[in-house]
């Protein structure tokens, strides 16, 4: 997880999972990353975010991502704060399975996301980034990634309601 606030803009975002899964009371957040992620507790029954075993700190988001975990400084050529969570989940899985993480940075350097996940390619000499979203949290993070990149850009948003991706696009109304 990430034990300290990183983004300032997330405070006004529509949240998923605002209520305690044990008693139904409204959760209290000391800080919030996006969607339901952050530091929360239930004022009624004491349910709270689990202790963080692998904590990302010194998180920086921009043209690339960087953070530290277990005194390892990791850098990835990805955009979007949500990718800190994705990378951290991969690292935690590796460590939980008993591996050292010694070559984790090398793996990051050679990993190439595909299928619309910050996929980079060129069309007639122009750089294009394709990023798929299938729910409000994902779409909000795509918007955040675009806004964090201060370089001039043209933005095209396309909506797909083909059967393989789901024909119900009503979730778009929940995007901030």
Task: List each language-model region with its residue ranges.
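Extended acidic/charged loop-beta regions that coordinate divalent cations
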Residues: 1-73
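Fold-independent oxyanion-binding glycine-rich loops
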Residues: 1-3, 23-25, 45, 93, ...
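Active-site beta-alpha connecting loops in nucleotide-dependent enzymes
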Residues: 10-18, 24-27, 114, 132-176
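Conserved active-site and cofactor/substrate-binding residues in soluble primary-metabolism enzymes
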Residues: 15-18, 62, 82-88, 99, ...
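A conserved, hydrophobic alpha-helical segment in the catalytic core
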Residues: 37-50, 78-109
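Gly/charged, well-structured mid-domain segments that form the phosphate/adenylate-handling core
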Residues: 47, 60-62, 93-133
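Short glycine/proline-enriched coil/turn segments at helix->beta-strand junctions
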Residues: 69-72, 100, 123-126, 151-152
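A short glycine/serine-rich beta->alpha loop
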Residues: 73-81, 127-129
